[in-house]
Curated annotation (Swiss-Prot):
One of its GO terms (cellular component) is cytoplasm. The gene is cspLB. It is found in: Cytoplasm. Its main location: cytoplasm. This is Cold shock-like protein CspLB. Homodimer.
């Protein structure tokens, strides 16, 4: 698992990016956020996640808020 900080997240479109210290930003889709109900992330929020290879490059999976 990796940790990072939410760079930005658009709740209307359902995606954003997570900033990883010493690495490239990672794409995150709302479907990768763990938990029930409305899934969104706040800018500056700390998260833990796994990186998988998506169709357009690395993306976050199993995202949990810290």
């Amino acid at each position: 698992m990796q940790t990072g900080t939410v760079k930005w997240f658009n709740s209307e479109k359902g995606f954003g990016f997570i900033e990883v210290e010493g690495g490239d930003d990672v794409f995150v889709h709302f479907s990768a956020i763990e938990g029930e109900g409305f899934k969104t992330l706040d800018e500056g929020q700390s998260v833990e996640f796994e990186i998988v290879e998506g169709q357009r490059g690395p993306q976050a999976e199993k995202v949990t808020k810290l």
